[in-house]
Amino acid sequence: MKMNKHYSELKASYLFVDIAHKVAAYQEAHPEKEIIRLGIGDVTQPLAKCVVKAMHDAADEMGTKEGFHGYGPEQGYPFLKQAIQGYYAGRGTKIAEDEIFISDGAKSDLANVLGLFDVDNTVLVPDPVYPTYVDDNVTDGRKIIYSRTSQENGFLGMPDENVKADIIYICSPNNPTGAAYTRDQLKVWVDYARKNNAIILYDAAYECFISDGDLARSIFEIEGARECAIEICAFSKSAGFTGTRCGYTVVPHELEREGMNINKLWLRRQTTKFNGVPYVVQRAAAAVFTESGMAEIQSNLDYYRRNAKVIADALDECGVWYCGGKNSPYIWLRCPGNMKSWEFFDWLLENCGVVGTPGVGFGECGEGYFRLTAFGDAEKTKLAAERIKDAIKAL
């Protein structure tokens, strides 16, 4: 039989696996040292109480003849889709219920949606980039081109009219850089996509962290986006569902290519290859949009925002350049002393006992930069910030 040869084209290991191996080796050599992890973007605050109650209630339902649920609708239960619809409407964005598809998280849909598009399409991704965008397309054999970003453009790449792309990845606020596009900047991307008959895959996983009014929470706030964009979002960062797994994808009715309606194609794909998210999980997700749910998750988001400010304030005090941290849980900093990314990783671990993520692991344009996250414990984040500040000042 023949294997998919493109898997052999992937990098030898995943970035966070390399980090884990380095940290394990250091911990084994220095068992007495406390290591503070500000690397991988997993949340640490527990699920909201009303979310847990909704899960309990749904589990109890499943234990009764009257309340038992077997296979659900592949595209999601109406109660959750209507709650999401209301969430968009509350921000002035109109989305039809049948444009919303419930998933087990953004990462799955970011990969699965590619099945609708031919492997001959050219893909445009930013550099630095969330590695999954690249790996998903490498394994399909697509041509990938990079939109290079830098400190000079605030790590926000803009379209190059000399470049033709068919699939465009945008993540705003961005992972890993924390940078976020304004509405005017997103309009330029939408116009570019429409001109090139391209489709934007818009990763909105971090929209919940946006506080500035001039930043879009959804690509569909931008005129023309319904004709060229698919939005993918999740409850992982907004509601702490990294271990619970639930997300959603919005595919507008207007989105068509080569005479095929992509909303209908995605529905057909889901009914063929996906059996839906568990009823208990969808009930938990719906609780997020209740009055008490929104209040509780905002409390958790504020917790992470305070962590971000603690890190940012420490970097400000020692004169280190960074972006992100305000509308994002990620702080993307210039490595002090002209250190390379992995050099700074080793230095930070040795001198501060702090783990972050080397920027070069996200692409060539990340060399010399480093990502810290605000998802840690508050007290440990304060301790890490003090250690980092003192160590950098001593350089």
Each predicted region: which residue ranges?
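Conserved glycine-rich beta-strand-loop-beta hairpin in the small C-terminal domain of fold type I
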Residues: Q282, A286, L301-A312, Y322-C335, ...
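Conserved core of the PLP fold type I
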Residues: E66-A193, E207-I222
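Helix C-cap/helix->beta junction micro-motif
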Residues: H30, D140, K195-N196, C318, ...
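PLP-dependent enzyme catalytic core of the Aspartate aminotransferase-like
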Residues: G86, K94, L124, N338, ...
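Conserved core segment of the aminotransferase class I/II
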Residues: I222-D302, K309, D313, K393
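Hydrophobic residues in well-ordered beta-strands that form the structural core
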Residues: V125, Y146, Y202, G356-P358
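N-terminal small-domain helix-loop-helix segment of the aminotransferase-like
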Residues: K2-D104, N112, V288-E291, A394-L395
